[in-house]
Amino acid sequence: MDDLSPDAFLAPYPDPIREAAHRLRAVVRRVVPDAIEAVRPGWHLVGYRVPAGRRSAYFGFVAPEPIHVHLGFEYGFLLEDPDRVLGGTTLRKVRFFTFRGPDEVDESLLAPFVRESARLAALTRAERLALVLDRDSESQEP
């Protein structure tokens, strides 16, 4: 993989998309200061990993497109979303927010989702499975 910088990766996008992407990157870096940021050119996104013991775990991404940019979460299906603000509910795992410009980026809304996404990613597979099973059993209780 090339060592493409996020700035270089985002440069071709329209100003509002690029600016929104930079704001989203800043939110992730503030909320998860030890996040490892890397451009994934094949996936057309900037991905984030969090250190988890002797490994690192993928937890989210900033994915620009010509008319909008997504802030997405790898284990989004496990995130609490009582107000149903996350998109991607028809997807298996990932959930996301969509922005058309920098003024739509609200750190106070996003920070809890970013923080929890990093925490979930750092769990072991067994711990995540236990969460799924707990939620399934809670939803089946009368």
Regions found by a protein language model. Give the residues of each.
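Charge-dense, helix-prone N-terminal extensions
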Residues: 1-142
